[in-house]
């Protein structure tokens, strides 16, 4: 009978997030092993390489972030959905600082084409549900949308909030950042009215 695994994938990814917070993007598998209190062999039993560990950490962090963003995009009132999606960006980064830092590890397009082979497909499609939810919000917010409306919605609910919160990642994200992100989102998207 095989011995049960001492560490789950999530235990290892939690260790990777802790190692990243302590050692930065050059964290090693030895740093991850130290964070979980186990041998490096336990990690290599589950993951083929350091690159895969940190790619999987990025994917998990993005997935957790997307869960709240999908909820915000789906709010019935499209104007409230715009504000809530922007607030979610900073609130998530405040509530889960390790995941926020982990989300800075990779660019989706690069991971999808140059990342470990086993993660490329997942990375290529990680934004599919978010893109579909944003398209739905676009139609609710602008009944006859143009490409310019889509640009405004993307800028207001994704790019601007990311830019507002990014300087705070790795430290304390002040509560006022939520309101700043929401106000900027409403103003940017409102340019399409």
Q: Which residues does each PLM region occupy?
A:
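Amphipathic alpha-helical packing segments from all-alpha helical-bundle domains
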Residues: 66, 70, 112-143, 148-155
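Amphipathic alpha-helical segments used for helix-helix packing
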Residues: 95-118, 166-170
């Amino acid at each position: 009978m095989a011995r049960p695994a001492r560490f789950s994938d999530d235990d290892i990814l939690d260790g990777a997030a802790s190692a990243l917070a302590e050692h930065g993007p050059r964290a090693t598998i030895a740093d991850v092993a130290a964070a979980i209190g186990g041998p490096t062999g336990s990690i290599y039993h589950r993951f083929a390489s350091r690159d895969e560990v940190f790619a999987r950490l990025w994917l998990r962090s993005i997935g957790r972030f997307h869960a709240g963003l999908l909820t915000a995009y789906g709010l019935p009132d499209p104007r409230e959905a715009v504000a809530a999606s922007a607030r979610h960006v900073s609130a998530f980064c405040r509530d889960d600082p390790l995941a926020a830092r982990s989300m800075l590890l990779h660019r989706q397009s690069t991971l999808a084409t140059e990342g470990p082979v086993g993660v490329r497909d997942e990375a290529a499609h990680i934004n599919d549900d978010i893109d579909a939810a944003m398209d739905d919000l676009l139609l609710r917010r602008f009944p006859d949308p143009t490409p310019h409306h889509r640009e405004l919605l993307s800028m207001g609910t994704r790019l601007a909030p990311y830019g507002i919160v990014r300087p705070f990642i790795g430290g304390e994200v002040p509560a006022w950042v939520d309101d700043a992100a929401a106000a900027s989102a409403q103003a940017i998207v409102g340019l399409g009215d």
